[in-house]
Amino acid sequence: ATAYSYLNESLGLEDFEAFLHEPAIAEKFDFLTSTTAEWTHEDLQTNPIARKEVARSLAIFSAFAEGVSLYSSFAVLYSFQMRDLLKGIGQQMKWSVRDESLHSKMGCQLFRHMCDEYPELLDECKESITKAAELIVQLETNFIDMIFEQGDLENLEKEDLLSLIHI
């Protein structure tokens, strides 16, 4: 959170919510926050619907929010560092990339563990996770289109970034 606060401060933004006035950002935010599931530990043990919703939420958030959605932003921020601009941001982004990568990896690992423990989850969640993947790629494409409205950056091309999220 400190890194993102520093980023907002460096960019002259008073708070995170300033970003939500951009439709491409608001759509991503709305989708990702709509995937959360609020169940207790006891619910997971006794309620198959709770397990399915938590597994789905975990997979979507871990793989797509922390594994896809942030990386185009990281790439753009790194492009500034490569041009010796926004110098303090570069190190913050390195730490954030490491942190988000661990979150993504561990969340996906936890999802796989849940599927090992409850094998029916994979089939129950597969379709909704696939649809979520398609949607997040589209939302991220919209976000990249917004970033590059005025053309490619000096050392980062839109098509390269699109290729990154379509892998």
PLM regions with names:
Residues 128-160:
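Primarily interfacial, aromatic-capped hydrophobic alpha-helices that serve as membrane anchors
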Residues 1-46:
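Long, hydrophobic, well-ordered secondary-structure blocks that form the structural core
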Residues 6-16, 45-57, 75-95, 109-127, ...:
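Inter-helical turn/loop segments and adjacent helix faces that build the functional surface
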Residues 95-100, 131-132:
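Transmembrane helix-bundle signature of multi-pass membrane transporters/permeases
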Residues 1-2, 55-80, 102-106:
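Alpha-helical bundle segments that constitute or directly flank the non-heme di-iron/ferroxidase center
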Residues 89, 103-106, 140:
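Alpha-helical interaction elements in eukaryotic regulators
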Residues 165-167:
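Conserved small/polar residues in nucleotide/adenosyl-binding loops
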